[in-house]
């Protein structure tokens, strides 16, 4: 039976399996060190996913093509393998999300090429509201002309190929590593259902408490090599990040 985990559960359980021992304070964040005898391997890969053509952007209030580039968009993969050889892969990308048709193709290819089952792979997204549209995602929200339909389909196919290849690279890069988990705090997330956006800056400046539930915790996983070099830092945050308007 497939068991679907949340991102927080994935981060927590992946590192807790190493039988954590010590907790070292680090300001508002702590890291728990993994048991020395635990054998972990980690592999990392990344790829630029900035479109080379003017693919419609997803997440704006109206359909919109790109008008320039502030910086590249990225897709990254972290592969983990425990002492028994069990593998999991976490993939993050600068998309708003991916449609089911695309994710089905990705999972099919990962199973065929690397024998990764669905429960061994997690897709996460920066959900930046200014990345390219994929497949039939938001097709009812962003009706576009035939030329754009073709561009989006072409770009989506490229991303499936690039994502699968990137996972293969991460698996090929598996090497001994130490995992540590911790938790920090960041307070910029605001409950927008209970606080009017225009009033938030003044309320914060006045020290007036905002209302409504929020989650300001930042779960963190640090991946280091045996020589102490930092290989990767993985974190998550509960916030709806509309970065551009």
Where are these regions (language model features)?
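Short linear sequence motifs
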Residues: 2-3, 23, 148
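Twin-arginine (Tat) signal peptide motif
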Residues: 3-11
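N-terminal export signals
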Residues: 11-31
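Conserved beta-alpha junction segments in alpha/beta enzyme cores
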Residues: 35-124, 128-245
